[in-house]
Amino acid sequence: GESSGDCRSNLLKINACYYTPSDGVLIPTGEKRAVKNTPFDFTAQKKIGGGFNAKELLATHGYDHNYILNGEHAAHAESEVTGVKMDVFTDMPCLQFYTGGQLGGVNGKSGKYNRWAGFCLEPQFCPDSINKQDFEKPVLNKDEEKSHYIKFNFAWN
């Protein structure tokens, strides 16, 4: 929660076996890579900051990556410090996971938010999917209607 330290000690599980690697300006390359045995593997709950020293995370100072979801229970996060738990449910195809690596003294409620002051779990279409053949397109044609849902459940001890 707010003013409870940075996000690296929080626990996270993401329901995804693949992520989309990015180029030098964080645009996905169009390929899918398996998360297994990489710093991107959150298929079992683990600490967010455990892989921050991996070479794949140096450019982003942590995570700013898109995951291809396996199902509607997209993610589970919890803080061992505060006891707050969060579950994310969605019918969107992907989830962007961002750990605030680009933050640097942003003004906030309790002062400055520095790098890793929090994290985001953002259900979405795959970035640049309009230009990638194998990804669902975020296109709505004339006279079409479409809806998606995103649900965040919170609990605490």
Tell what function each PLM region has:
Residues G1-N157:
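An exposed, glycine/acidic-rich loop-and-rim segment of catalytic or binding clefts
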